[in-house]
Design a protein with these regions (language model features):
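Conserved N-terminal/central alpha/beta ligand/cofactor-binding core
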Residues: 2-88, 163-164
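Flavin (FAD/FMN)-binding glycine-rich loop and adjacent Rossmann-like elements that form
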Residues: 2-3, 83, 106-117, 121-443
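Short amphipathic alpha-helical face segments that pack within enzyme cores
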Residues: 60-64, 294, 444
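Short secondary-structure boundary/hinge segments and terminal tails
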Residues: 90-91, 146
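Short acidic-glycine loop/turn motifs at beta-strand connectors
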Residues: 92-93, 301
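Short, hydrophobic/aromatic-rich segments at coil-to-beta transitions
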Residues: 93-99
Length: 444
Protein backbone atom coordinates (compact mmCIF):
# COMPACT_ATOMS: atom_id res chain seq x y z
CA UNK A 1 0.00 0.00 0.00
CA UNK A 2 3.03 2.30 0.33
CA UNK A 3 4.67 1.07 -2.86
CA UNK A 4 7.91 0.08 -1.12
CA UNK A 5 8.89 -2.91 -3.24
CA UNK A 6 12.64 -3.09 -2.68
CA UNK A 7 13.51 -4.77 0.61
CA UNK A 8 16.35 -2.69 2.06
CA UNK A 9 17.90 -4.86 4.77
CA UNK A 10 21.56 -5.51 5.28
CA UNK A 11 24.42 -6.16 7.66
CA UNK A 12 28.13 -5.51 7.21
CA UNK A 13 30.39 -8.57 6.94
CA UNK A 14 34.12 -8.29 6.22
CA UNK A 15 33.69 -4.67 5.17
CA UNK A 16 30.86 -5.31 2.70
CA UNK A 17 27.12 -5.01 3.02
CA UNK A 18 25.16 -8.20 2.59
CA UNK A 19 21.71 -9.52 3.49
CA UNK A 20 21.19 -10.30 7.15
CA UNK A 21 20.21 -13.92 8.00
CA UNK A 22 16.55 -14.56 7.16
CA UNK A 23 14.17 -16.61 9.27
CA UNK A 24 10.54 -17.06 10.30
CA UNK A 25 7.72 -15.24 8.55
CA UNK A 26 10.16 -12.86 6.85
CA UNK A 27 11.87 -15.79 5.16
CA UNK A 28 8.51 -17.27 4.16
CA UNK A 29 7.49 -14.02 2.45
CA UNK A 30 10.85 -13.78 0.67
CA UNK A 31 10.45 -17.32 -0.63
CA UNK A 32 7.06 -16.38 -2.05
CA UNK A 33 8.55 -13.25 -3.64
CA UNK A 34 11.32 -15.28 -5.23
CA UNK A 35 8.86 -17.90 -6.45
CA UNK A 36 6.68 -15.23 -8.07
CA UNK A 37 9.64 -13.57 -9.79
CA UNK A 38 10.99 -16.92 -10.98
CA UNK A 39 7.62 -17.84 -12.48
CA UNK A 40 7.19 -14.40 -14.08
CA UNK A 41 10.71 -13.50 -15.22
CA UNK A 42 12.68 -16.73 -14.95
CA UNK A 43 14.91 -15.31 -12.18
CA UNK A 44 14.21 -14.80 -8.47
CA UNK A 45 15.86 -11.35 -8.23
CA UNK A 46 15.09 -9.32 -11.36
CA UNK A 47 15.63 -5.83 -9.90
CA UNK A 48 19.42 -5.39 -9.72
CA UNK A 49 18.70 -2.58 -7.27
CA UNK A 50 21.29 -0.56 -5.39
CA UNK A 51 19.53 -0.91 -2.02
CA UNK A 52 18.56 -4.57 -1.96
CA UNK A 53 18.61 -7.92 -3.73
CA UNK A 54 14.90 -8.65 -3.22
CA UNK A 55 12.27 -6.71 -5.19
CA UNK A 56 8.56 -7.15 -5.84
CA UNK A 57 5.97 -5.18 -7.79
CA UNK A 58 2.90 -3.73 -6.01
CA UNK A 59 0.12 -5.96 -7.36
CA UNK A 60 2.23 -9.08 -6.91
CA UNK A 61 3.08 -8.07 -3.33
CA UNK A 62 -0.60 -7.58 -2.52
CA UNK A 63 -1.39 -11.03 -3.90
CA UNK A 64 1.41 -12.62 -1.86
CA UNK A 65 0.10 -11.14 1.39
CA UNK A 66 -3.48 -12.13 0.57
CA UNK A 67 -2.33 -15.70 -0.12
CA UNK A 68 -0.34 -15.72 3.11
CA UNK A 69 -3.42 -15.14 5.27
CA UNK A 70 -5.93 -16.96 3.05
CA UNK A 71 -5.85 -20.22 5.08
CA UNK A 72 -6.68 -18.31 8.27
CA UNK A 73 -9.50 -16.46 6.53
CA UNK A 74 -10.87 -19.73 5.15
CA UNK A 75 -10.81 -21.34 8.61
CA UNK A 76 -12.66 -18.37 10.06
CA UNK A 77 -9.89 -17.52 12.53
CA UNK A 78 -9.14 -14.24 10.73
CA UNK A 79 -11.55 -11.66 9.34
CA UNK A 80 -10.31 -8.74 7.24
CA UNK A 81 -12.21 -5.45 7.15
CA UNK A 82 -11.09 -2.66 4.82
CA UNK A 83 -11.57 1.09 4.36
CA UNK A 84 -12.16 1.81 8.05
CA UNK A 85 -10.71 4.34 10.50
CA UNK A 86 -10.90 4.18 14.32
CA UNK A 87 -13.05 6.95 15.76
CA UNK A 88 -13.66 5.85 19.34
CA UNK A 89 -12.11 3.46 21.85
CA UNK A 90 -14.53 1.61 24.13
CA UNK A 91 -13.45 1.26 27.75
CA UNK A 92 -14.63 -0.06 31.09
CA UNK A 93 -12.74 1.89 33.70
CA UNK A 94 -9.08 1.82 32.63
CA UNK A 95 -9.51 -1.34 30.53
CA UNK A 96 -9.90 -1.26 26.75
CA UNK A 97 -12.82 -3.36 25.54
CA UNK A 98 -13.13 -2.49 21.84
CA UNK A 99 -12.94 0.05 19.04
CA UNK A 100 -15.55 1.81 16.95
CA UNK A 101 -14.68 2.47 13.30
CA UNK A 102 -16.18 4.68 10.62
CA UNK A 103 -15.94 4.04 6.89
CA UNK A 104 -13.27 5.92 4.97
CA UNK A 105 -15.55 5.83 1.91
CA UNK A 106 -19.25 6.53 1.51
CA UNK A 107 -19.80 2.87 0.62
CA UNK A 108 -18.23 1.51 3.82
CA UNK A 109 -20.54 1.11 6.83
CA UNK A 110 -19.33 1.80 10.36
CA UNK A 111 -18.19 -1.10 12.51
CA UNK A 112 -17.80 -1.80 16.23
CA UNK A 113 -15.42 -4.53 17.38
CA UNK A 114 -15.37 -5.71 21.00
CA UNK A 115 -12.43 -7.84 22.12
CA UNK A 116 -10.46 -8.65 25.27
CA UNK A 117 -7.20 -7.56 23.59
CA UNK A 118 -6.73 -4.73 21.07
CA UNK A 119 -3.36 -4.50 19.26
CA UNK A 120 -2.51 -1.18 17.62
CA UNK A 121 -0.03 -1.72 14.78
CA UNK A 122 -1.19 1.33 12.80
CA UNK A 123 1.24 3.84 11.32
CA UNK A 124 0.23 6.72 13.59
CA UNK A 125 -1.01 4.79 16.64
CA UNK A 126 -4.60 5.93 16.20
CA UNK A 127 -6.12 3.57 18.78
CA UNK A 128 -3.47 4.36 21.38
CA UNK A 129 -4.06 8.08 20.87
CA UNK A 130 -7.84 7.74 21.14
CA UNK A 131 -7.61 5.42 24.16
CA UNK A 132 -6.04 7.97 26.46
CA UNK A 133 -2.97 5.80 26.94
CA UNK A 134 0.22 7.73 27.56
CA UNK A 135 2.45 8.19 24.53
CA UNK A 136 5.18 10.43 23.11
CA UNK A 137 5.76 11.93 19.67
CA UNK A 138 8.72 13.83 18.29
CA UNK A 139 12.08 14.17 20.04
CA UNK A 140 12.72 13.28 23.67
CA UNK A 141 14.98 15.74 25.45
CA UNK A 142 18.41 14.62 26.65
CA UNK A 143 17.31 15.09 30.25
CA UNK A 144 14.77 12.27 30.00
CA UNK A 145 16.97 9.29 29.09
CA UNK A 146 20.46 10.84 28.87
CA UNK A 147 20.76 9.72 25.23
CA UNK A 148 23.77 11.15 23.37
CA UNK A 149 21.84 12.08 20.21
CA UNK A 150 18.83 13.63 21.99
CA UNK A 151 18.49 17.44 21.94
CA UNK A 152 19.21 19.25 25.21
CA UNK A 153 16.38 21.71 24.53
CA UNK A 154 13.78 22.36 21.87
CA UNK A 155 14.41 25.00 19.23
CA UNK A 156 11.85 26.60 16.93
CA UNK A 157 10.78 23.23 15.53
CA UNK A 158 9.70 22.16 19.00
CA UNK A 159 8.24 18.68 19.14
CA UNK A 160 7.31 18.55 15.43
CA UNK A 161 10.59 17.07 14.20
CA UNK A 162 10.11 13.50 12.98
CA UNK A 163 11.63 11.14 10.47
CA UNK A 164 10.16 12.42 7.18
CA UNK A 165 7.43 10.79 5.14
CA UNK A 166 7.90 9.90 1.48
CA UNK A 167 5.19 9.38 -1.09
CA UNK A 168 6.67 6.68 -3.28
CA UNK A 169 6.33 6.75 -7.06
CA UNK A 170 6.15 3.42 -8.92
CA UNK A 171 6.96 3.57 -12.64
CA UNK A 172 6.86 1.28 -15.68
CA UNK A 173 8.43 1.85 -19.05
CA UNK A 174 6.09 3.48 -21.56
CA UNK A 175 7.58 1.58 -24.52
CA UNK A 176 9.56 4.58 -25.74
CA UNK A 177 6.65 7.02 -25.55
CA UNK A 178 6.77 10.31 -23.66
CA UNK A 179 4.62 10.25 -20.53
CA UNK A 180 5.42 13.52 -18.75
CA UNK A 181 3.18 14.30 -15.78
CA UNK A 182 1.72 17.82 -15.38
CA UNK A 183 3.73 20.32 -13.36
CA UNK A 184 2.47 20.20 -9.74
CA UNK A 185 1.33 23.58 -8.34
CA UNK A 186 3.99 23.49 -5.60
CA UNK A 187 6.85 22.68 -8.00
CA UNK A 188 10.07 24.70 -7.78
CA UNK A 189 13.09 23.53 -9.76
CA UNK A 190 15.48 24.67 -7.01
CA UNK A 191 13.91 22.19 -4.59
CA UNK A 192 15.35 19.39 -6.72
CA UNK A 193 18.71 20.93 -7.62
CA UNK A 194 20.50 17.94 -6.08
CA UNK A 195 19.23 15.89 -9.04
CA UNK A 196 20.97 18.26 -11.45
CA UNK A 197 24.41 17.15 -10.25
CA UNK A 198 24.04 13.39 -10.63
CA UNK A 199 23.25 10.85 -13.34
CA UNK A 200 19.55 9.90 -13.32
CA UNK A 201 20.41 6.37 -14.49
CA UNK A 202 23.58 4.27 -14.56
CA UNK A 203 24.24 1.12 -16.57
CA UNK A 204 24.85 -1.19 -13.63
CA UNK A 205 23.73 -4.76 -12.98
CA UNK A 206 24.90 -4.42 -9.34
CA UNK A 207 27.21 -7.42 -9.74
CA UNK A 208 29.47 -5.75 -7.18
CA UNK A 209 26.84 -6.29 -4.50
CA UNK A 210 24.27 -4.06 -2.83
CA UNK A 211 25.37 -0.50 -2.13
CA UNK A 212 28.19 -0.68 -4.68
CA UNK A 213 28.75 3.06 -5.37
CA UNK A 214 28.88 2.62 -9.14
CA UNK A 215 25.26 1.43 -9.11
CA UNK A 216 23.66 4.39 -7.34
CA UNK A 217 21.22 6.63 -9.18
CA UNK A 218 17.58 7.65 -8.66
CA UNK A 219 16.54 5.07 -11.27
CA UNK A 220 18.62 2.11 -10.08
CA UNK A 221 18.36 2.96 -6.37
CA UNK A 222 15.29 0.74 -5.90
CA UNK A 223 14.70 -0.68 -9.36
CA UNK A 224 12.08 -3.44 -9.37
CA UNK A 225 12.68 -5.14 -12.73
CA UNK A 226 15.86 -4.68 -14.81
CA UNK A 227 14.94 -5.97 -18.22
CA UNK A 228 18.03 -4.49 -19.92
CA UNK A 229 20.64 -6.55 -18.06
CA UNK A 230 18.38 -9.58 -17.65
CA UNK A 231 17.35 -9.73 -21.33
CA UNK A 232 13.63 -9.60 -20.49
CA UNK A 233 10.76 -8.61 -22.75
CA UNK A 234 10.16 -4.91 -23.58
CA UNK A 235 7.52 -3.41 -21.31
CA UNK A 236 8.67 -5.29 -18.20
CA UNK A 237 11.08 -2.63 -16.91
CA UNK A 238 9.91 -1.13 -13.61
CA UNK A 239 11.35 1.03 -10.85
CA UNK A 240 10.15 3.12 -7.96
CA UNK A 241 11.33 6.37 -6.47
CA UNK A 242 12.09 6.52 -2.77
CA UNK A 243 15.06 8.87 -2.95
CA UNK A 244 16.13 11.37 -0.27
CA UNK A 245 15.24 14.30 -2.54
CA UNK A 246 11.56 13.41 -2.25
CA UNK A 247 11.61 13.08 1.55
CA UNK A 248 9.12 15.44 3.17
CA UNK A 249 10.11 16.78 6.64
CA UNK A 250 7.22 17.16 9.08
CA UNK A 251 8.43 20.39 10.69
CA UNK A 252 9.07 23.88 9.24
CA UNK A 253 6.07 23.33 6.99
CA UNK A 254 5.40 25.56 3.96
CA UNK A 255 3.12 28.53 4.59
CA UNK A 256 0.33 27.10 2.42
CA UNK A 257 0.24 24.01 4.64
CA UNK A 258 0.32 26.00 7.87
CA UNK A 259 -2.48 28.23 6.61
CA UNK A 260 -4.58 25.22 5.64
CA UNK A 261 -4.13 23.71 9.08
CA UNK A 262 -4.95 26.94 10.90
CA UNK A 263 -8.08 27.53 8.83
CA UNK A 264 -9.28 24.02 9.66
CA UNK A 265 -8.24 24.05 13.34
CA UNK A 266 -6.49 27.03 14.99
CA UNK A 267 -3.21 26.04 16.64
CA UNK A 268 -2.85 22.78 14.72
CA UNK A 269 0.06 24.02 12.56
CA UNK A 270 2.30 23.95 15.66
CA UNK A 271 1.38 20.41 16.72
CA UNK A 272 3.19 17.19 15.93
CA UNK A 273 1.44 15.34 13.10
CA UNK A 274 0.82 12.36 15.41
CA UNK A 275 -1.59 14.41 17.54
CA UNK A 276 -3.69 15.52 14.57
CA UNK A 277 -6.93 13.82 13.49
CA UNK A 278 -7.05 12.23 10.05
CA UNK A 279 -8.52 15.20 8.15
CA UNK A 280 -5.70 17.48 9.37
CA UNK A 281 -2.99 14.92 8.62
CA UNK A 282 -4.35 14.85 5.06
CA UNK A 283 -3.50 18.55 4.60
CA UNK A 284 0.16 17.82 5.31
CA UNK A 285 0.28 14.58 3.35
CA UNK A 286 -1.29 16.16 0.27
CA UNK A 287 1.68 18.52 0.10
CA UNK A 288 4.05 15.58 0.57
CA UNK A 289 2.41 13.91 -2.42
CA UNK A 290 2.77 17.09 -4.49
CA UNK A 291 6.46 17.23 -3.56
CA UNK A 292 7.00 13.66 -4.77
CA UNK A 293 5.28 14.42 -8.06
CA UNK A 294 7.46 17.51 -8.34
CA UNK A 295 10.53 15.32 -8.16
CA UNK A 296 9.21 13.06 -10.93
CA UNK A 297 8.33 16.09 -13.06
CA UNK A 298 11.86 17.45 -12.57
CA UNK A 299 13.40 14.15 -13.66
CA UNK A 300 11.16 14.05 -16.73
CA UNK A 301 11.83 17.65 -17.79
CA UNK A 302 14.87 19.52 -16.41
CA UNK A 303 17.04 16.43 -15.95
CA UNK A 304 15.99 15.00 -19.33
CA UNK A 305 16.92 18.28 -21.02
CA UNK A 306 20.34 18.22 -19.32
CA UNK A 307 21.21 14.62 -20.19
CA UNK A 308 19.51 14.26 -23.54
CA UNK A 309 17.29 11.43 -24.67
CA UNK A 310 18.06 7.77 -23.91
CA UNK A 311 15.85 4.68 -23.42
CA UNK A 312 15.93 4.78 -19.61
CA UNK A 313 14.97 8.45 -19.33
CA UNK A 314 12.25 9.10 -16.77
CA UNK A 315 10.44 10.86 -19.59
CA UNK A 316 9.70 7.41 -21.00
CA UNK A 317 8.35 6.02 -17.71
CA UNK A 318 4.69 6.13 -16.68
CA UNK A 319 2.97 5.83 -13.34
CA UNK A 320 1.75 2.28 -12.74
CA UNK A 321 -1.99 1.60 -12.62
CA UNK A 322 -1.59 -1.27 -10.12
CA UNK A 323 -2.87 0.64 -7.08
CA UNK A 324 -6.28 1.40 -8.55
CA UNK A 325 -6.11 5.01 -7.32
CA UNK A 326 -7.23 8.01 -9.42
CA UNK A 327 -3.73 9.54 -9.38
CA UNK A 328 -1.97 6.16 -9.86
CA UNK A 329 0.05 6.66 -6.68
CA UNK A 330 0.11 4.39 -3.62
CA UNK A 331 -2.93 4.95 -1.36
CA UNK A 332 -0.69 6.00 1.52
CA UNK A 333 2.82 7.40 2.01
CA UNK A 334 5.85 5.64 3.42
CA UNK A 335 5.64 6.51 7.13
CA UNK A 336 8.87 5.97 9.05
CA UNK A 337 7.90 7.19 12.50
CA UNK A 338 4.66 7.36 14.49
CA UNK A 339 3.92 7.69 18.17
CA UNK A 340 5.81 5.82 20.89
CA UNK A 341 3.93 4.03 23.59
CA UNK A 342 4.68 4.82 27.23
CA UNK A 343 5.24 1.16 28.00
CA UNK A 344 6.24 -0.84 31.06
CA UNK A 345 9.72 -1.06 29.55
CA UNK A 346 11.23 1.52 27.19
CA UNK A 347 14.32 0.57 25.18
CA UNK A 348 16.70 3.51 24.75
CA UNK A 349 19.65 4.43 22.58
CA UNK A 350 21.98 3.73 25.50
CA UNK A 351 20.70 0.15 25.63
CA UNK A 352 21.69 -0.80 22.12
CA UNK A 353 23.59 1.78 20.08
CA UNK A 354 26.82 0.34 18.65
CA UNK A 355 29.97 2.08 19.86
CA UNK A 356 32.18 0.71 17.08
CA UNK A 357 31.87 -0.35 13.45
CA UNK A 358 31.92 -3.96 14.67
CA UNK A 359 28.57 -4.43 16.43
CA UNK A 360 28.58 -6.66 19.49
CA UNK A 361 25.96 -7.72 22.03
CA UNK A 362 23.80 -4.85 23.23
CA UNK A 363 24.47 -3.24 26.60
CA UNK A 364 21.10 -4.45 27.88
CA UNK A 365 19.47 -7.75 26.93
CA UNK A 366 15.91 -7.88 28.35
CA UNK A 367 14.98 -11.13 30.08
CA UNK A 368 11.48 -11.07 28.54
CA UNK A 369 12.73 -10.78 24.95
CA UNK A 370 10.27 -11.54 22.16
CA UNK A 371 12.41 -10.79 19.09
CA UNK A 372 16.00 -10.15 18.05
CA UNK A 373 17.23 -7.38 15.79
CA UNK A 374 20.21 -5.42 14.54
CA UNK A 375 19.94 -2.57 12.06
CA UNK A 376 21.16 0.79 10.87
CA UNK A 377 19.55 3.67 12.79
CA UNK A 378 18.08 5.24 9.70
CA UNK A 379 17.20 8.91 10.01
CA UNK A 380 16.33 10.46 6.68
CA UNK A 381 16.59 14.28 6.53
CA UNK A 382 14.33 15.62 9.27
CA UNK A 383 14.41 19.36 8.52
CA UNK A 384 14.14 21.76 5.60
CA UNK A 385 15.73 25.07 4.69
CA UNK A 386 14.05 27.62 2.45
CA UNK A 387 16.19 28.93 -0.39
CA UNK A 388 14.47 32.33 -0.70
CA UNK A 389 12.55 34.68 1.59
CA UNK A 390 9.30 33.12 0.36
CA UNK A 391 7.93 30.68 3.00
CA UNK A 392 6.07 28.95 0.17
CA UNK A 393 9.11 28.92 -2.07
CA UNK A 394 11.73 26.30 -2.91
CA UNK A 395 13.29 24.32 -0.09
CA UNK A 396 15.80 21.54 0.39
CA UNK A 397 16.21 18.97 3.12
CA UNK A 398 18.69 19.11 6.01
CA UNK A 399 20.39 16.29 7.88
CA UNK A 400 21.17 17.36 11.44
CA UNK A 401 24.38 16.43 13.25
CA UNK A 402 22.76 13.80 15.48
CA UNK A 403 20.19 12.39 13.06
CA UNK A 404 21.53 10.69 9.98
CA UNK A 405 22.59 7.38 8.45
CA UNK A 406 25.79 7.02 10.46
CA UNK A 407 24.83 4.88 13.45
CA UNK A 408 23.99 1.23 14.03
CA UNK A 409 22.61 -0.95 16.79
CA UNK A 410 24.41 -3.79 18.48
CA UNK A 411 22.85 -7.26 18.42
CA UNK A 412 19.78 -6.56 20.51
CA UNK A 413 16.44 -7.96 21.63
CA UNK A 414 13.09 -6.31 22.32
CA UNK A 415 11.12 -6.91 25.54
CA UNK A 416 7.54 -8.09 25.86
CA UNK A 417 6.99 -5.31 28.40
CA UNK A 418 7.75 -2.83 25.60
CA UNK A 419 4.34 -3.65 24.07
CA UNK A 420 2.32 -3.12 27.26
CA UNK A 421 1.12 0.38 28.23
CA UNK A 422 1.76 1.58 31.76
CA UNK A 423 -2.00 1.90 32.28
CA UNK A 424 -4.64 0.55 29.89
CA UNK A 425 -5.27 -3.20 30.33
CA UNK A 426 -6.49 -4.85 27.14
CA UNK A 427 -4.26 -2.73 24.86
CA UNK A 428 -0.94 -3.63 23.22
CA UNK A 429 1.36 -1.68 20.92
CA UNK A 430 3.05 -3.13 17.83
CA UNK A 431 4.99 -1.98 14.77
CA UNK A 432 5.99 1.67 15.27
CA UNK A 433 3.88 2.07 18.39
CA UNK A 434 6.02 0.40 21.04
CA UNK A 435 8.11 1.34 24.07
CA UNK A 436 11.15 2.92 22.45
CA UNK A 437 12.77 6.32 22.10
CA UNK A 438 12.99 8.33 18.86
CA UNK A 439 16.79 8.25 19.01
CA UNK A 440 16.80 4.71 17.62
CA UNK A 441 13.30 3.47 16.70
CA UNK A 442 13.15 3.80 12.91
CA UNK A 443 11.39 0.66 11.62
CA UNK A 444 12.06 -0.06 7.94
Amino acid sequence: SEGVGCIDEWIQVDGRRTNFPRSGLFLEVLRRIRAHNSATYGIPNPGNAFCGTETIEPAAAASIFEDLVAPSVKRGSLRIERNLRPTEVLAEGDSIRGVRFSGSTDQTPSLTVRAPITIDASDWGDVIRLSGARYSAGPDLHSRYNEPSAPKQFDETGEQEMNPVSWCVVLREANGNDDVIPRPPSYHALSFAALDRIAPWVASDMSGGIYSPSGNSPYTHRRLVDRWHNALQPGTEATFLNYPTQDYPLCQLPLRVRNGLEQASPGSSKQNIVHLPHHLKEIILADAKSHALGMLHHLQTAVHQRTGDFPQSFRHMRLTDEFGTPDRLPPKPYIREGLRLEALDVLTENDLRAKTKEPRWAARMPTDSILAFQFNIDFHPTRRKYLTEDPDGPWQFIHTASRGWHTDTDRATFPLAGLIPVARPGLLGAGHTVGATPAWLQPP
